[in-house]
């Protein structure tokens, strides 16, 4: 969770997940990716018995789609979780595309990829359109505060070492989907403009007194932008997503020119140098590109800081960045050539840079329309429209034979569970209108073994049934683990049933939760 070293109950997110997934997807092969994947899977799907490991609030957040307000700073836990889920999904997709013959988990990567990619869209669950910000919700879905009492300048509460303004852009994995929440790319740009224009005042909120991050953010003098701490570091580059890259270029130059020079107002290193991120931000930004969408083998383009920069790679090759006219005045990119060829996109593939490359920037004193059309922008999970994570809307359920405490399987909380008979057992769902089920999830119980074989069936009329998916010899590696199973050919049905095979050892089995996930109408 946090490089302390060792386990420590600090900060939010299990960001080793995105860090190692990103490394693998960029070609780093000096670690055991299978062991890492299982570690990331455990972070994302297993309720940890230890406070210093795993993700907080997971017993409900997996099913609600967000970490609720019963968890301190649950919104920040949620938002970092979506970024990590995105990276896990991308790694799973890569491993599914090229499975190793001796990998015992090979058959499951594709299911995981589908599951984690849709989980990465869960940020939409915390966006309150009444206030235009991400806001915490309780387990029942109620907002922490209504529009009358909401204060985007207040630190803490839902937000770790920051406020609602600095969490307003915390979905780099799905920039176009985020933009849709603000009315489109122009709306995202307007929200960013307001962010940088809002005076750098702060309200201490749940912290009770100023903490150093508040004071450092104020001293940045770029509105609410707090370059002093990690939650803000990607925000400038979100102008690329909004289709206004000249504003990224302008503000990157401002940060590099003012916030790293020292002496004037005590800035120098402008804040927390946690695990080297402040230096890394400088080096990437000075080179003219930045890893905005961690967990993908690509970078977004900003603007170079130096007339000439040469990065020597371990393979003996070089990334050469030339911008002979660049200056505080000539801060805007007018054009770019990569290895001598015109480049009109805002992304650079990692593989291209890793083999050595020459980037030639043409700079000028005024903004240009270079790489600002739709086709030039960074990709997103949701290319168009509002994000639509899969949901389980609930339905009338029954079981044969009768399962005592059946409702525990549908209460969005893995702390409760139900015991299934050792004999074959069927659970049925009856919806008021036909719906499509794309994923089945099962969550193992705390102690008893989970079922190992089942068939998911569906019916239009409740009488004629079609088998959608069959699984055999399934295993849950950990207690209270949520596993996802993709439906190969989903259709529109009003009736579903899950038929569990009899236990091979004739002993009862147990589950903590079942979900039938599909798109919402």
PLM regions: where:
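Aromatic/His-enriched, Gly/Pro-containing loop or helix-boundary segments
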Residues: 2-14
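Active-site core of glycosidic bond-cleaving carbohydrate-active enzymes
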Residues: 13, 17, 27-320, 324-325, ...
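Short coil-to-beta strand junction motifs in C2/discoidin
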Residues: 304-306, 328-333, 447-455
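Short strand-turn-strand beta-turns centered on an Asx-Gly dipeptide
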Residues: 314, 338-341, 461
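C-terminal beta-strand-rich structural cap/linker in extracellular carbohydrate-active enzymes
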Residues: 350-383
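Predominantly extracellular/luminal regions of secreted and cell-surface proteins
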Residues: 386-412
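Aromatic, loop-rich ligand-recognition surfaces of beta-strand-rich domains
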Residues: 404, 408-472, 479-521
């Amino acid at each position: 969770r946090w490089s302390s070293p060792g386990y420590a109950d600090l900060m939010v997110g299990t960001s080793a997940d995105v860090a190692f997934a990103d490394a693998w997807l960029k070609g780093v092969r000096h670690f055991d990716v299978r062991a890492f994947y299982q570690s990331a899977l455990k972070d994302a799907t297993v309720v940890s018995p230890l406070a210093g490991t795993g993700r907080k609030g997971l017993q409900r957040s997996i099913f609600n789609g967000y970490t609720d307000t019963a968890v301190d700073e649950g919104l920040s836990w949620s938002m970092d979780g979506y970024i990590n889920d995105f990276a896990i999904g991308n790694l799973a997709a890569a491993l599914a595309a090229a499975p190793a013959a001796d990998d015992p988990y090979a058959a499951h990567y594709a299911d995981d990829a589908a599951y984690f990619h849709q989980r990465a869209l869960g940020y939409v669950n915390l966006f309150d359109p009444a206030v235009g910000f991400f806001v915490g919700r309780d387990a029942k879905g109620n907002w922490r505060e209504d529009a009358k009492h909401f204060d985007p300048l207040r630190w803490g509460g839902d937000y770790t070492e920051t406020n609602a303004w600095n969490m307003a852009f915390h979905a780099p994995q799905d920039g176009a989907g985020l933009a849709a929440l603000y009315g489109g790319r122009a709306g995202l740009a307007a929200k960013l403009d307001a962010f940088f224009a809002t005076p750098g005042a702060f309200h201490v909120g749940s912290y009770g007194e100023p903490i150093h991050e508040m004071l450092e953010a104020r001293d940045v003098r770029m509105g609410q932008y707090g370059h002093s701490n990690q939650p803000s570091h990607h925000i400038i580059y979100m102008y690329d997503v909004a289709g206004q890259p000249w504003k990224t270029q302008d503000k990157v130059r401002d940060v590099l020119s003012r916030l790293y020079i020292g002496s004037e107002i005590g800035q120098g290193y402008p804040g927390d140098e946690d695990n080297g991120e402040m230096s890394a931000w400088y080096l990437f930004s000075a080179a003219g590109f930045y890893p905005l969408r961690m967990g993908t083998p690509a970078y977004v383009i900003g603007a170079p800081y130096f007339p000439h920069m040469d990065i020597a790679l371990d393979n003996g090759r070089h990334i050469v960045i030339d911008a002979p006219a660049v200056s505080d005045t000539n801060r805007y990119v007018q054009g770019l050539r990569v290895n001598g060829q015109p480049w009109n996109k805002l992304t650079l593939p990692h593989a291209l840079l890793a083999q050595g490359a020459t980037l030639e920037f043409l700079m000028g004193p005024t903004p240009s329309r270079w790489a600002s059309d739709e086709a030039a922008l960074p990709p997103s999970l949701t290319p168009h429209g509002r994000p639509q994570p899969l949901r389980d809307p609930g339905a009338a359920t029954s079981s044969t034979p009768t399962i005592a405490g059946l409702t525990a399987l549908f209460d969005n909380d893995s702390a409760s569970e139900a015991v299934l008979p050792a004999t074959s057992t069927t659970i049925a769902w009856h919806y008021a209108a036909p719906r499509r089920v794309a994923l089945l999830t099962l969550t193992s119980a705390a102690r008893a073994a989970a079922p190992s074989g089942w068939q998911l069936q569906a019916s239009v009329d409740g009488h004629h049934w079609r088998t959608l998916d069959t699984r055999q010899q399934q295993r849950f590696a950990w207690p209270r683990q949520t596993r996802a199973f993709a439906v190969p050919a989903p259709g529109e049905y009003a009736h579903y049933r899950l038929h569990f095979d009899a236990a091979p050892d004739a002993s009862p089995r147990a589950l903590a939760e079942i979900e039938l996930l599909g798109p919402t109408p």
